[in-house]
Amino acid sequence: HNIVFSNSNYEQMARCTFDLIYDYNPLFVINVGGCNPIADLCNNITTVCCMPCINKPALSTSSIYIRYFPYTEDDDRIYNDLLLNYQHVYDMPFVEELSGSNGCIQVKSDYGIDEDKFAIIIAGNRLDKEIRQRFIQLLNDISSPEDNVVFVFIGDCPLLKNTLKDCDFYNKCVFTGAVSNFKGAVSIGDLFLNPPRQGGSTGAYYAIECGIPVLTLPSCDVASVGNAFTCHTIDEMSDIIHRYMHDSEYMNQQIQNCRSSFKKICSCKDNLPSITSFISKLKEYMNNGGR
């Protein structure tokens, strides 16, 4: 089923969705993303597992959280500190799109970009809300001394596009809009630049798979690709990017870090055993009276 919600029919569709799940009487429900009142209502009829797409627990009344990304001991402690007493977290590493992505690799000329340009990828579905003035200033700082740079915005962002029209570097911007081959679009880049935000990890994983270094703050979800791709503050990013552009030895080292980081991430992504293990733990939890 693919149920389409809108502001005009939300209550009606919510009731239909709940009734549909009730009639199916499933063993459990997985809520991808979190912050879903319909999924929370389903806690009254079955076990609901919340799988956030960020590295922190999303707001949910579910008793089970599913975590699918790599984490450190400190990450685990912080994650569990944010849970309520009745909530538990189970790991289910599952990033099938990394190894099984069907998108073909693309080139810069597919988007009207000269192949000798240094393409900085900025990707996401919420760029209109995520790009703040400080990040725009960063783009200006990057572009001011560089004639050879181009910023490639992947995803619909009409408000951001309108805002950047008044910026001196607007002629160095390319807006792809929504793309059917996300990995292919990311693959044209020389660097994946992550604005301060939650989410964005899929694009970063695609980047390192393609040997494209990532630059992000350590507090962002994208930092899960590895410490080699983080910096402490946004003020450092401009100098680091200029180093990527002009220090080939540094760039080559970071490309090697992409390969080792991607190999490490994918080494634990054997999906079937991961899913089987999660189901076994969930059934044990439910057999012991949990919901």
Where do the PLM segments sit?
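Short acidic alpha-helix that forms the nucleotide-activated donor recognition element
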Residues: 18-19, 23-24, 178-190, 209
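Catalytic binding pocket for nucleotide-activated donors in carbohydrate/polymer assembly enzymes
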Residues: 78, 195-263
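A charged, aromatic-enriched C-terminal amphipathic alpha-helix characteristic of glycosyltransferases
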Residues: 246-287
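Conserved catalytic-core segment of nucleotide-activated headgroup transferases in glycan assembly
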Residues: 73, 84-166, 175
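Active-site and donor-binding regions of nucleotide-sugar-utilizing enzymes
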Residues: 1-59
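Active-site-proximal region of nucleotide-activated glycan assembly enzymes
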Residues: 45-102
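Conserved active-site histidine-acidic residue motif and adjacent donor-binding/catalytic loop
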Residues: 8-13, 157-159, 173-186, 199-200
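Acidic donor-binding loop of glycosyltransferase active sites
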Residues: 24-28, 187-200, 212
